[in-house]
Every structure is written in structure tokens, then in C-alpha cells.
Amino acid sequence: MFTLKKSLLLLFFLGTINLSLCEQERDADEEERRDDDEMDVEVEKRFLPLAVSLAANFLPKLFCKITKKC
């Protein structure tokens, strides 16, 4: 009975170590994903004002050429 308890305790201990290692890897993977998402958001923030300013400069000229009311 004592050896059975010892074996179960050993399995439990090894299982908890394995779970904690998997959890650390998962947390590291999630951090990497978050970094990519943050970079995408930064790129979107940089791209949107640029696109708006280009559209503000280009659209009036295009509208003028299409309607020929300059």
C-alpha cells in the first residue's frame, strides 16, 4: 500500500511539473501573438492617417477632372 501511494505521489508530482511547463510555453506563445497584434495595430495607426491625407489631396483633383468644373 505504501509503494502504491509513493507511485501515485510521484506520478502526481511529475504531472504537475509537466502541466506547469506546458503552461509556461503557452503563456510565452500568447505573448508572442500579442506582440504581433500590437505591431499590426501600430501599422494600422500609421497607415490610416497617411491614407486619409493622400485621399484629401487626390480626391479633389480627381473630382475636378471628372466633372470638369474647376
Curated annotation (Swiss-Prot):
GO terms for cellular component: extracellular region. Expressed by the skin glands. Residues 1-22 form the signal peptide. Pfam families: Antimicrobial_1, FSAP_sig_propep. Keywords: Amphibian defense peptide, Antibiotic, Antimicrobial, Cleavage on pair of basic residues, Cytolysis, Disulfide bond, Fungicide, Hemolysis, Immunity, Innate immunity, Secreted, Signal. It is found in: Secreted. InterPro entries: Antimicrobial_frog_1 (IPR012520), Frog_antimicrobial_propeptide (IPR004275). One of its GO terms (biological process) is killing of cells of another organism. Disulfide bonds join 64-70. Residues 23-46 form a propeptide. Its main location: secreted. Antimicrobial peptide with activity against Gram-positive and Gram-negative bacteria and against fungi. Has been tested against S.aureus (MIC=5.5 ug/mL), E.coli (MIC=6.5 ug/mL), B.dysenteriae (MIC=2.2 ug/mL), and C.albicans (MIC=7.5 ug/mL). Can regulate or mediate antimicrobial response by stimulating mast cell degranulation. Induces histamine release. Shows cytotoxicity toward solid tumor cell line HepG2. Also shows a potent hemolytic activity (LD(50)=5 ug/ml). Belongs to the frog skin active peptide (FSAP) family. Brevinin subfamily. This is Brevinin-ALb. The lineage of its organism: Eukaryota, Metazoa, Chordata, Craniata, Vertebrata.
